[in-house]
Amino acid sequence: MQSTYLNYALRQLEAIVNIPSPSGFTAEAVRYCSNEFANMGYTPEITPKGGLLVCLGGEGEGLLLGAHIDTLGAMVREVKANGALRVAPVGGLQANNTETETVHVYTRAGKVLEGTLQLENASVHVNGEYSKTQRTFDTLELLLDAKTHSAAETRALGVDVGLSLIHISEPTRH
């Protein structure tokens, strides 16, 4: 019996953490949780600000439990002249934890573009300061997996300052 609950909890955890949901971009994760509560027989309510309320019932004094569904992420801070992007963190995201991570950029048109965060001068064999360079959001850039060599070409893909949310992908572990 205990392994049934554990397996269910692990399946739900995997499903939830794989839904892109940086702060301000949580509607899909909230819908998923709402549907799961409804499937269990509860009556979830999505608030006007996108929160989720679920009365679990019970007896005695009431108890309020709170949790958050959002994850860390970033947003486009600058479209650089070379077509790369400079990003700003959303939440407590730390630059030194993002280098070489795959990111998904969500355009307003619903298009998802992939890219990689890396040091601006990432050529270890020619950059003598590579290991000494502090990783900050001023020294990292996002290179899209698209052929762009200018700000105009990147903007033509639907990417611009402040409009595109970025989901920092976690490595897959099995």
Where are these regions (language model features)?
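N-terminal hydrophobic/helix-forming segments and targeting peptides
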Residues: 1-169, 173
